[in-house]
Every structure is written in structure tokens, then in C-alpha cells.
Amino acid sequence: MVAREMFVAGECFVRLRPRRAEDGLLVPLQMQLLQSEMLPFDKTGLTVDGNVVRCGIEFDLIGRRVAYHFRRSHPGDSTDQRVAVPETVRVPAEDVLHIYRPIDAGQIRGLPHVAPAMVRLFLLDQYDDAELDRKKTAAMFAGFITKTAPEDPMMGEGVADLDGAAMASLEPGTMQVLLPGEDVKFSSPADVGGGYEAFQYRTLLAVSASLGLPYHLVTGDVRQANYSSLRAELVEFRRRVQQLQHGVIAHQLCRPVWRRWLEIAQLAGRLDLSDPAAARMVQWIPPRWDWVDPLKDIQAQVLAMEAGITSRRKVVEATGYDVEEVDRENAADAART
């Protein structure tokens, strides 16, 4: 959820909230996820003690974050009728985790990852709607009956519309008898031909590039892909994802939460740690990646281990498991046999 919020809104705030012992929690700690809208961009100014508030974030004289000024309710929530409470509440910075990926020096708020593609997606949506309206309009006219003589037929014309033009309905199995001088011309609306699909492909290709995602993952279209192209795109895509996993999610979210959880659990008497500093030294293993051709990848990993390029620990951790746990399971399986 944090990663999705960061991708859509550019950032996510996690408030660490210690609880009372009577709340019945095993470890009296909860996390509250706050959207980007909860921290107002227009909250700026000076505090009484001389700190500076920029975009809802309070900085001290040396530029260190000391507090966040959150709204008490979401600005788009029309069901919250609390109007007597202050607009914002000050939360100390040690209780707030600001999850975002900075791309500029001095950046203090997150930028949505989908922002570079929004204009193209909006124009593509308008183009699709216009093409759908054009096809709907063209499908309403089955054909036209033309006459060479201006006189009315003996049996009268069809029911006229508001402009005075006669109209005739067309039903399945109808055999229309025409009078002398009348002719039927079927509607042949202009078509965009092959330009529609080519335009969509180029636009979605640019959208995929701006999002940093492979084209086939954005559209689900693998008609023009092969094994080599899919693997090349996936390798680059997974490199970007791993940067976010280890450089943003693990560093900004997992490590602070783990440290606070250990602290609260030890204070609550749930853990007896002889070396708290060693307990904080953990390794974060993200979920594994599934390859297009697992056989070739496993063979390549085996060759890399035999050549001494990589270790078995790294190969096992790349699958999302802990090497010690795998060794214990293998030993248990061997003991059963």
C-alpha cells in the first residue's frame, strides 16, 4: 500500500503511534498511513520558536525536520463535519516516516511517478472517445435513398424528422420496394485505417517509457515481443524496482519501523535482548522474481556459482528465501529419507 501510494501520489506518510497497555496489543505500536493530501502544501510560515514551516514540514535553524503539520481530516472527505477543531495538528518528526523518492537536491516533497505520463494519457483518452463517437455516429446511418424526381411517391414518404427529411427504418429480413427513379446508397463512412492502432502503439510506448515500465506490462500486448526483448526489458525494469526496494522502501520504511518495534517490544517486556544493537542489524529480502525461462536462468546461476562469480547465499536470497532456512529444510528432508 505504501509503494502504491508513492507511485500514484509521489509520497506516503506513516505515523508511528504507541498505544497503552490496556489496548490489548502484544506490542503496543500501530502504524497509521496518511495520504499526501493530509500534509497541506500551502502550510508555510514561521513558528514562535523561529522554525520555518515549508509545505507543511517544520524545519529548525539548521534545516533538520522537527515536525509535520497534518490535517485532522482529509480535505476531500465531505462526511467529516468537525469544524471546531484546528485545521492542522503538529506531529513530532520522530513519529513520522516520509516515504518518497527524491530526484532533485533539496527536494522536500514527493513527485508522482505517473506525472510525466498524465498529459499523454489524457490525450489518448480523448482520442479514443472521439474515435468511439465517430464509429457510433457512422453506425446509425445504414444507407440513403435518393430520388431523381422531386414529386412525392403515391404512397407518401416516411416519417419526417425535425429538419423535414424523410426517414425509413431498416429491420432484419426487410425487402424494400423502390419506386421508379429511387436508388439506395449505403453509408460508407471514412475510416482511419491502420493509423489508429499505430497511433495507440506509439503513444502507449511513450507512456511506458515515461513511467519506466515495460510496454508489455502496461498494455498486456506481447505480439511484437520475443524472449530476448522481454528479458532485456525485464532486466532493466527489475533493476529500477530493486533500487526502490532497497533505497527507498527498506531504508525509509522497513528499518525505522523495525527499530521502533524492537524498542517498544523491549519496553513492554515482550523481548529480552542482551544486545539490542545486534538485533537491529537485519537483512531485508524482497519477494522473488519469476523469469520468463526458469531453466535457462537456473543453469546460468549454477554456472556462476561454479565459476566463483557469485555465492550460493546470494542465489538463494534472490529467490526470496533465507539460505539458513533452506539449509534447515534440506537437512530435515534428508533426515526423513
What are these regions (language model features)?
Residues V14, L124, L253:
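Short, conserved catalytic/metal-binding motifs centered on acidic residues
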Residues V2, L16-P18, R134-M140, V218-V222, ...:
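Short coil/turn segments at secondary-structure boundaries
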Residues A93-E233:
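Extended, charged amphipathic alpha-helical segments
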Residues G63, V207, V315:
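Acidic/polar, glycine-anchored loop/turn motif associated with catalytic or activation segments
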Residues Q176-L295, E324:
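Surface-exposed loop-to-helix/strand elements on domain peripheries
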Residues M1-I99:
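Structured, mid-chain assembly/scaffold modules that mediate subunit interfaces
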Residues E5-M6, A265, A304-M305:
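Hydrophobic side-chain positions on well-ordered alpha-helices
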Residues W291-T337:
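Charged substrate- and nucleic-acid-binding regions of tRNA-handling and nucleotidyl-transfer enzymes
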